[in-house]
Curated annotation (Swiss-Prot):
Residues 901-1052 form the C1q domain. Residues 146-166, 228-256 have a biased composition (Polar residues). GO terms for molecular function: extracellular matrix constituent conferring elasticity. This is EMILIN-2. Residues 1-30 form the signal peptide. Residues 44-120 form the EMI domain. It is found in: Secreted, Extracellular space, Extracellular matrix. Residues 789-812 have a biased composition (Pro residues). It comes from Homo sapiens.
């Protein structure tokens, strides 16, 4: 521990050299060392940073011990020198070995990975043997023996397209999302490595500043010590700057009276030497350590000797670090954008394929629609021709029986309208989704991709339109089918009624021939009533089927997603209008045809009612005839009995035909009437049969058309499901795209914050390097010469030693000039820990934040965060493990207050080409807009609304008509800011003294031109209060109104 002490005048030069070496070593240690391998996270994504606590041994000063050293009074190689020895009492420090806990970052395998190179993951348990990657060493500590051997790892190369080639550690089966997440993790690790480098550089500079402060204090104590020792000079001893001279032991025994003074002085010298010895030993150890590190760095670099100055070296080092950071950031951004591009292309390819599939299906639907349309037109023409034929026939049907059919037709029209509305809603929702996909993000340039997506969306819209046409034609065919079925059913029912009526008439004829008995005629109403009941039953059954079809259609419409409604895009309005026109024309045609059918059925019902009334009247006539015949027969029998009883009056027999003649005449008349009635009924039956044949066929076809409509509704269900799947797929793609964009924005914001923090740190680094250089120059300038001092004359009083200038103040405590006559103080205690201050507030570089807590927070050691149990590392010392968070950075001054909008370009300019207002005055409506950036000026109201708080330049030029004037006011939020009068300012009292007949001065055009402060939402306009403002009927502007946003309000800067 003890070494011979060198002469004191040479010590300060040694300190200066040691400080220079310390500064160089600290700067070299701040960044990644050239001899060490690169950090694994820069090339491999399976390494994770853990915060660990380790116990390290260190030598701690524990007091000092004194010893007596014999010294010669003369220097080396000085021949004429007395041989008397001088004994000096010196002090040396005493050190003991202690242990302390330090916290550092250590790279270990991430959870789920294992192996020597952390390449064995959950998907690939067996890996071939590859070189073990190098484990990063702490930039402020040496590598321990338990770290694995260092091997170089192959770097990733970039392809010509700028994308990173996958390394052997990346699973080729991973999808684009996993690759993006891993690349983002690589960027975060790179930023963390740069942050760690800057923090190490700050800690090194802080240590250099602290050592420089201690060295300055030691230098001051050393220069103060010769003054203390020179107060008691001895005639045969050499005065030194830090020791107390003494004579041989015999001399001490002879001077008992001066021992107390010597002991007190020895105590003072002991304290001083103790402090100096401690500092020298500490500085010596640090210098040796830095010299060894410098030697290693020089051997690893194997480059020529640096001939640059210190500032140029610092500048080159910082520039290299900033360039490396820029290259890494740009490379990461290129990779991220390439991954996003590949992902978007993959998703768009899948979407295109799906749209192509639906397009092929829609083409088949279009062909089917064409066929259905052709058949529908043919059926409509046939139905129109059939319905026009029986228009001149007599009415034979009851109009009350056809009310249900009209109601059903109206219901079918409502259903068609509902289906069309549902189709429009689906198309509108699809258009909204496509419009949202077409609108690009302002921060990302995907013009080519959006154009391609727009083209594919147009194809999808066209297919949707064709699908609408398909639905229209299908419904049209279903309606025609139902109408045909209804006609067929009516024909069948009328045929059955004709058959029954024929049988009734035949029975009536038979009964009339058999003495015209009434039972046959009485049975006609019953038969007719049963036929009507069957017709009503059939119509009710048809109504029920139509109601079922309506319920199915309503369920299909309600089953569609509620968010599909929306307005059709402008480019599809024409197609939609055409579709609606076709639907309306179809509805009108069907409604007209159904009305004609209804009229025909009513005529048939009227004919049936008339026939029923005729039959009833015939039945009454037959009954009356039967009564007359019975009366006639009774009278005949009575007359014959009376003439028989008389016997002698035979002449009365000739008179018997007289009562029989009316009977014969009545029978013949009744027979003629019956013949006419029969012929009329037969003719009417033929007419009714001809009229109702088409209706019967159409009614019979309604049931088949209803079933066809049910099938169409089932097809609509499948189409609705396909549209729902398309919507879900589009929503997934859009949400994934927005997630990627948000992740990119977050990464860019974090990188921006990191770059700003690095810039601040570099600026502070420059300032502190400049301070250190200044301090070193001051130390070198004010150090005493290296020559050996000669003993001062005993008669002269000791001079006060030259002291260096005080160092600049430090945050740990202000440096004060010490008085040489005061007792030396003990070494200062290390400064207490306090929360970090913002950079620039003090002169010291300190970390502005601590590492964030790892996963699972636990506190141990000195209160640092401890992670959850991770994978066991190679070290033997237990410590907290977990993912390390990024340290904090100084908060940059806010550019704008929270919540204040970011100002953008705002300007407008408008002119007047028409009459500004209907009355004589008011707000001028500058109708012709030339520029309106930000859409801040409303030409319909003539008001400019300020979007932000700030300064605005407002300009207005008003031109009156010839031989007229204009008086106007510039209004801001209904408050007058400036006035204008083209005739000039006038005082009110002059108006009373103006001579009569004086000319009115009109003047020329007037203008407002001023800078005003506006708040967000303030309204600015020009109000004319008098005069006439010039305007023309042509596109010529004589009055203008302009404004521009200059800069935001100063409180937001």
């Amino acid at each position: 521990m003890w070494q011979p002490r060198r002469p004191w005048p040479r010590v300060p030069w040694r300190w200066a050299l040691a400080l220079l070496a310390l500064v160089g070593a600290g700067l070299c240690h701040a960044g990644p060392q050239p001899g060490y391998p690169a950090r694994p996270s820069a090339r491999n994504k399976n390494w994770c940073a853990y915060i660990v606590n380790k116990n390290v041994s260190c030598s701690v000063l524990e007091g000092s011990e004194s010893f007596i050293q014999a010294q010669y009074n003369c220097a080396w190689n000085q021949m004429p020198c007395p041989s008397a020895l001088v004994y000096r009492v010196n002090f040396r420090p005493r050190y003991v070995t202690r242990y302390k806990t330090v916290t550092q970052l250590e790279w270990r395998c991430c959870p789920g990975f294992r192996g020597g190179d952390c390449q064995e993951g959950p998907k690939d348990p067996v890996k071939t043997l590859r070189p073990t990657p190098a484990r990063p060493r702490n930039s402020l500590k040496k590598a321990t023996d338990n770290e694995p051997s260092q091997f170089s790892e192959p770097r990733k190369t970039l392809s010509p397209t700028g994308t990173a080639q996958p390394s052997w550690g990346v699973d080729p089966k991973e999808g684009p999302q996993e690759l993006q997440e891993k690349k983002i993790q690589v960027l975060e690790e790179k930023v963390l490595r740069l942050t760690r480098t800057v923090l190490d550089l700050q800690s090194s500079l802080a240590g250099v500043s602290e050592n420089l402060k201690h060295a300055t204090q030691d230098d001051a104590s050393r220069t103060r010590a010769p003054g203390l020792s020179s107060q008691h000079p001895k005639p045969d001893t050499t005065v030194s700057g830090d020791t107390e001279t003494g004579q041989s032991p015999g001399v001490f025994n002879t001077k008992e009276s001066g021992m107390k003074d010597i002991k007190s002085e020895l105590a003072e010298v002991k304290d001083t030497l103790k402090n100096k010895s401690d500092k020298l030993e500490e500085l010596d150890g640090k210098v040796k350590g830095y010299e060894g590190q410098l030697r290693q760095l020089q051997e690893a670099a194997q480059g020529p000797t640096v001939t640059m100055t210190t500032n140029e070296l610092y500048q080159a080092y910082v520039d290299s670090k900033i360039d490396a950071l820029r290259e890494e950031l740009m490379e990461g951004m290129d990779r991220k954008l390439a991954d996003l591009k590949n992902s978007c292309e993959y998703k768009l390819t899948g979407l295109q394929q799906q749209c192509d599939d639906y397009g092929s299906s829609y083409l088949g639907v279009i062909e089917l629609i064409g066929e259905k349309e052709t058949s529908l037109r043919k059926e409509i023409n046939n139905l129109r021709a059939r319905l026009q034929e029986p228009s001149a026939q007599a009415n034979c049907c009851d109009s009350e029986k056809n009310g249900d059919i009209g109601q059903q037709i109206k219901t079918l029209d409502q259903k068609i309208e509902r289906v069309a509305e549902a189709t429009r809603m689906l198309n509108g929702r699809l258009d909204n989704e496509f419009d949202r996909l077409i609108v690009p993000e302002p921060d990302v340039d995907f013009d080519a991709k959006w154009n391609e997506l727009d083209a594919r969306i147009n194809v999808t819209e066209k297919n949707a339109e064709e699908h609408c046409f398909y639905i229209e034609e299908t419904l049209r065919g279903a309606i025609n089918g139902e109408v045909g079925d209804l006609k067929q059913l009516v024909d069948q029912k009328i045929q059955s009624l004709e058959d029954r009526l024929g049988s009734v008439l035949l029975q009536m004829t038979n009964n009339t021939g058999a003495e015209l008995s009434p039972p046959g005629a009485a049975a006609l109403p019953g038969v007719s009533g049963s036929g009507d009941e069957r017709v009503m039953m059939e119509l009710n059954h048809l109504k029920d089927k139509v109601q079922v079809v309506e319920d199915i259609c309503l369920l299909n419409i309600q089953g569609k997603p509620h968010g599909m409604e929306g307005a059709l895009p402008n480019r599809e309005d024409r197609a939609v209008r055409d579709s609606l026109h076709l639907l309306k024309s179809l509805n009108d045609t069907m409604h007209r045809k159904f009305q004609e059918t209804e009229q025909t059925i009513q005529k048939l019902q009227q004919d049936f009612s008339f026939l029923y009334s005729q039959l009833n009247h015939t039945e009454n006539d037959v009954t009356h005839l039967q009564k007359e015949m019975s009366n006639c027969r009774a009278g005949e029998n009575a007359g014959m009995g009376r003439f028989t009883k008389v016997g002698e009056q035979e002449r009365t027999v000739d008179t018997l035909p007289s009562p029989q003649h009316p009977v014969a005449h009545c029978c013949s008349q009744l027979e003629e009437r019956w013949q006419r009635l029969q012929s009329q009924v037969i003719s009417e039956l033929d007419a009714c049969k001809e009229c109702t044949q088409g209706v019967q066929r159409e009614v019979s076809m309604v049931e088949g058309r209803v079933s066809h409509m049910e099938k169409t509704c089932s097809k609509l269900d499948s189409i609705s499901g396909n549209l729902q799947r398309i919507k879900e797929g589009l929503n997934k793609h859009v949400s994934s795209l927005w997630n990627c964009v948000r992740q990119m924005n977050g990464t860019l914001r974090s990188h921006s914050r990191d770059i700003s923090g690095l810039k601040n740190s570099v600026q502070q680094f420059y300032s502190h390097v400049f301070q250190i250089s200044t301090d070193l120059q001051d130390l070198v300038k004010f150090q005493p010469s290296a020559k050996a001092p000669s003993p001062p004359p005993p008669a002269e009083a000791p001079k006060e030693p030259l002291q260096p200038e005080p160092a600049p103040p430090r945050p740990s405590g202000p440096a004060t000039a010490e008085d040489p006559g005061r007792r030396p103080v003990l070494p200062q205690r290390p400064p207490e820990e306090r929360p970090p201050q913002p950079p620039g507030s003090t002169g010291v570089i300190a970390e502005t934040g601590q590492a964030g807590p790892p996963a699972g927070a636990g506190v141990s050691g000195r209160g640092l965060p401890r992670g959850v149990d991770g994978q066991t590392g190679s070290g033997t010392v237990p410590g907290a493990e977990g993912f390390a968070g990024a340290p904090g950075y100084p908060k940059s001054p806010p550019v704008a207050s929270p919540g204040a909008p970011v100002p953008s370009l705002v300007s407008f300019s408008a002119g007047l080409t028409q009459k500004p207002f209907p009355s004589d005055g008011g707000v001028v409506l500058f109708n012709k807009v030339l520029v309106n950036d930000g859409d801040v000026y409303n030409p319909s109201t003539g008001v400019f609304t300020a979007p932000y708080d700030g300064r605005y330049l407002i300009t207005a030029t008003l031109t009156p008509e010839r031989d007229a004037y204009v008086e106007a006011v510039l209004s801001v939020s209904n408050a007058s800011v400036a006035q204008l009068h083209t005739a000039g300012y006038r005082r009110e009292f002059l108006e009373y003294h103006r001579p009569p007949g004086a000319l009115h001065t009109c003047g020329g055009p007037g203008a407002f031109h001023l800078i005003v402060h506006l708040k967000a939402g303030d309204a600015v306009n020009v109000v004319v209060t008098g005069g006439k403002l010039a305007h023309t009927d042509f596109d010529e502007m004589y009055s203008t109104f302009s404004g521009v946003f200059l800069y935001p309000f100063l409180s937001h800067l």
